[in-house]
Amino acid sequence: MKYKTIQTLMLPDSEEENYGLYYQGTEGVRLIGGEEKSLYIPENGNVDLFTYFNGFYPKQWAQYAELNGLHVKVTVSGSCSVSLCHTDGKRTVVNGEEECLAGDEERTVTFEVPDPQHSKAFWICVKGLKQGGYLRNITVQTEVERLQEVNLAAVICTCRREKEVIGNLERISRMDIKERPEIFLIDNGNTLTEYMVP
């Protein structure tokens, strides 16, 4: 069976940009920067990914993708315990937990997601064991059964990214009109002014 990745782990460029949108953690949890970002979870520390960017919300995804055979792959190294959690809106349930003593080697743990339509959200929790562990990646995948016509969309939070957004809009405005994508700009934080947008 073929699988398609529909969501991956998102991490900020720096810990100062987290604001609880990417991850929540106990004292000692650190963002490791570089080309392949990761999270370090110290011994007895916890990181919880029930957040805006890293929680998985089945009802929203069901509008755009088939959620058959849904599973979550978590890549870690070091010593940690990985849990798949979900909420039905009233309580939090741990669907599966696996202890990983991978040392320096990366190890991937796969969780099958039971009946995603009856859950409001799924997320991963990681607890650091002896000498701590690293959360390297998370991918949410589903079976590919049929092709669907797709209109691609790129979404970016404009908060503290005004220069990048304006720069990209200027580049797009210089494209040939036939190849130029349609742009919808929603500035919820009201940080952009009308004269800034090309």
Tell me what each language-model feature is:
Residues 169-180, 191:
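Short, acidic, metal-binding catalytic loop of nucleotide-sugar glycosyltransferases
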Residues 187-196:
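A conserved acidic beta->alpha catalytic loop
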Residues 162, 180-181:
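Secondary-structure boundary/capping signal
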Residues 183-185:
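Hydrophobic/aromatic residues located in beta-strands of well-ordered beta-sheets
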Residues 167-168, 195-197:
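Short alpha-helix adjacent to the SAM-binding motif of class I
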Residues 3, 9-11, 15-67, 71, ...:
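N-proximal low-complexity "stem/linker" segments adjacent to membrane-targeting elements
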